[in-house]
């Protein structure tokens, strides 16, 4: 009875158009991707530096009240839990109850007395080994 006829044929994208779009997306990913990853790596280094500064403030408060910095054996845990035999401890000296790991999932290193000051507090960076460059560089308190 009624017949609907199409005057225009439906068309999809041609193979050439799809290849051009994929090529443009690949170029964008190649140009923008490394820059985004660079900023993400820098953010982890900045986070480690801020955490080290927060630990440093807690260590200074510990020193003011107790009269010394925590020993290497007491470590950073002395900022959240009173070490045995310490009478003037009025902590916790950090907002968090647990000592966080560095942004790369490794423990911070603490040594007192330090080689570079009253104490040394540092992260070994992404590679978790001494030295390095860029995101692998050590983040230190001195």
Say what each PLM segment does:
Residues 1-13:
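N-terminal leader/signal peptides at the extreme start of proteins
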Residues 10, 42, 61-65:
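Conserved amphipathic alpha-helical interaction elements at protein-protein interfaces in regulatory
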Residues 8, 41, 48, 68-69:
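Alpha-helix initiation/capping motif
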């Amino acid at each position: 009875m009624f017949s609907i006829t199409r005057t225009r044929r439906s068309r999809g994208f041609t193979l050439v158009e799809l290849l051009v779009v994929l090529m443009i997306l690949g170029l964008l990913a190649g140009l923008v991707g490394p820059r985004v990853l660079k900023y993400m790596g820098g953010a982890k280094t900045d986070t480690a530096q801020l955490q080290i500064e927060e630990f440093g403030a807690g260590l200074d408060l510990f020193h003011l009240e107790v009269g010394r910095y925590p020993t290497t054996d007491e470590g950073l845990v002395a900022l959240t839990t009173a070490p045995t035999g310490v009478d003037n401890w009025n902590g916790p000296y950090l907002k968090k109850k647990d000592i966080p790991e560095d942004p790369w999932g490794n423990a911070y290193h603490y040594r007192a007395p330090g080689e570079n000051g009253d104490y040394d507090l540092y992260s070994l960076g992404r590679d978790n080994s001494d030295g390095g460059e860029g995101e692998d560089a050590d983040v230190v308190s001195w």
